[in-house]
């Protein structure tokens, strides 16, 4: 990603989640519109904007390590994102090469910040309480694959989970109007996007602050008119999956039946300790309801082990839940105590070695389940979004709708029987021929094969 500058080139280093990525893309778009060159290669520029993550300690350490490495290369730094929001003036004091800090609610001011840095100022542009949310009018230059785009439907979070610092870093929830989201979706469709991923902190709570009640179902139906084949929803909290939302999943053809459910735990006592008591009587009942209404639904969840007070009984409850519910994809994290969260001061810490052993046990339990869930797709012909192509061998790599980018598996695609191949960004039919724990194998299907298969099934 490089543009022709009329002003100096600014490099970008992106860290953290896809919500952070959208903020990066807006900053890139704003600087490009103002005439700056923008690049992802730090060697191209004297000034580097680092959009940082501060969600957990490991992420903070990665952000600080990146900042120190760039500082030692002699770069001038503009520190943006969650680390800037978290530590603010302390960063300017600790890193002399840091010329500015930009908070999570202030990235729209990046051009002004850079102009002030250019005349020698050290700038602190961090609002105490973030209130801004970008929209379709804010310039944006995407940094993701040409065919995939993330669309932020809301910013911030009204929940106060005991382990999570995000509300302090990004403020309370503030949703965009449906019309604004649909307008941006049309813009992205015009750019050739094939997969649109809706994101926020709690996507199923979309609209609650703006309309007085959640409006995800209405949003999905409105997006049904956008010419993008796949619309995927991330961060669907269980209580927000109402019958109307599940009906929208069924009714809107381009909404893929993929549910990303960050459940965190199954035991009621653990959920109360996590300040998620509303979820305790929902998990099993909701999952049964989802499978009844969306038989082909792909279910992903994330879980936390080693939360303070988690006993062996609590953990075995979670093991039983995982074995019973048979998710397609599971991510497991060990508890990370974060200063400024309620959980940071809780007693009865779990030994880190015990927490790691529990994580390993959950993943060992899940792997054959994931393999079995994948094997159900062998013999089917599905659409695959091609993301890589080897012109020498003809082999392709892509994803079908059951795999979200970066967090799930991939489909390894062989050329069709008549030599058919496809370029990245193409959505093509593929017959699934094999499966393993995480990935699928397949062969591209030509028109003749598709006609023959349909006639054989008739």
Swiss-Prot record:
GO biological process, one term: tRNA modification
GO molecular function, one term: metal ion binding
Primary localization class, coarse: cytoplasm
Protein EC: 2.8.4.4
Domain Radical SAM core residue range list: 143-372
Reaction(s) this enzyme catalyzes, per UniProt: L-aspartate(89)-[ribosomal protein uS12]-hydrogen + (sulfur carrier)-SH + AH2 + 2 S-adenosyl-L-methionine = 3-methylsulfanyl-L-aspartate(89)-[ribosomal protein uS12]-hydrogen + (sulfur carrier)-H + 5'-deoxyadenosine + L-methionine + A + S-adenosyl-L-homocysteine + 2 H(+)
Gene Ontology CC: cytosol
Top EC class of this enzyme: transferase
PANTHER family cross-referenced by the UniProt entry: RIBOSOMAL PROTEIN S12 METHYLTHIOTRANSFERASE RIMO (PTHR43837), RIBOSOMAL PROTEIN US12 METHYLTHIOTRANSFERASE RIMO (PTHR43837:SF1)
Function: Catalyzes the methylthiolation of an aspartic acid residue of ribosomal protein uS12.
Record's protein name: Ribosomal protein uS12 methylthiotransferase RimO
Native organism: Synechococcus sp. (strain CC9605)
Gene: rimO
């Amino acid at each position: 990603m490089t543009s022709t500058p009329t002003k100096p080139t600014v490099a970008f280093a992106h860290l953290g989640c896809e919500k952070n990525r959208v903020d990066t893309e807006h900053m890139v778009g704003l600087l490009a519109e103002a005439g700056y060159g923008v690049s992802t290669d730090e060697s191209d520029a004297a000034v580097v904007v680092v959009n940082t993550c501060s969600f957990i300690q490991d992420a903070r350490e990665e952000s600080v390590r990146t900042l120190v490495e760039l500082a030692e290369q002699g770069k001038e730094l503009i520190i943006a994102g969650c680390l800037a929001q978290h530590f603010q003036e302390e960063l300017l004091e600790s890193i002399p090469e840091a010329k500015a800090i930009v908070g999570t609610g202030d990235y729209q001011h990046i051009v002004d910040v850079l102009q002030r840095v250019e005349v020698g100022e050290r700038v602190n542009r961090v609002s105490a309480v973030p209130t801004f949310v970008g929209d379709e009018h804010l310039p944006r230059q995407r940094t993701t694959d040409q065919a995939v785009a993330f669309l932020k439907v809301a910013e911030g979070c009204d929940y106060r989970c005991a382990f999570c610092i995000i509300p302090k870093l990004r403020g309370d929830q503030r949703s965009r109007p449906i019309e604004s989201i649909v307008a941006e979706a049309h813009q992205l469709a015009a750019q050739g996007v094939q997969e649109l991923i809706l994101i926020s902190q709690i996507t199923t709570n979309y609209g609650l602050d703006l309309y007085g009640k959640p409006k995800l179902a209405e949003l999905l139906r409105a997006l049904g008119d956008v010419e993008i084949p796949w619309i995927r929803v991330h961060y669907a909290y269980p209580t927000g999956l109402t019958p109307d939302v599940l009906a929208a999943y069924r009714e809107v053809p381009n909404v893929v039946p993929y549910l990303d459910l960050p459940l965190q735990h199954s035991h009621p006592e653990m959920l109360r300790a996590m300040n998620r008591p509303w979820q305790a009587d929902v998990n099993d009942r909701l999952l049964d309801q989802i499978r009844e209404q969306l038989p082909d639904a792909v279910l992903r969840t994330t879980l936390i082990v080693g939360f303070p007070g988690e006993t062996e009984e609590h953990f075995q409850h979670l093991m039983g839940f995982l074995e019973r519910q048979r998710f397609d994809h599971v991510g497991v994290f060990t508890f990370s105590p974060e200063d400024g969260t309620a959980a940071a001061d809780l007693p009865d810490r779990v030994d880190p070695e015990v927490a790691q052993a529990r994580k390993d046990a959950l993943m060992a339990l899940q792997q054959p389940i994931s393999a079995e869930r994948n094997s159900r797709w062998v013999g089917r012909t599905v659409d695959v979004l091609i993301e890589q192509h080897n012109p020498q061998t003809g082999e392709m790599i892509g994803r079908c709708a059951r795999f979200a980018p970066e967090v799930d598996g991939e489909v390894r695609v062989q050329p069709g029987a008549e030599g058919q191949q496809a370029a990245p960004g193409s959505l093509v039919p593929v017959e699934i021929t094999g499966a393993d724990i995480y990935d699928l194998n397949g062969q591209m299907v030509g028109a003749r094969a598709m006609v023959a298969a349909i006639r054989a099934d008739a």
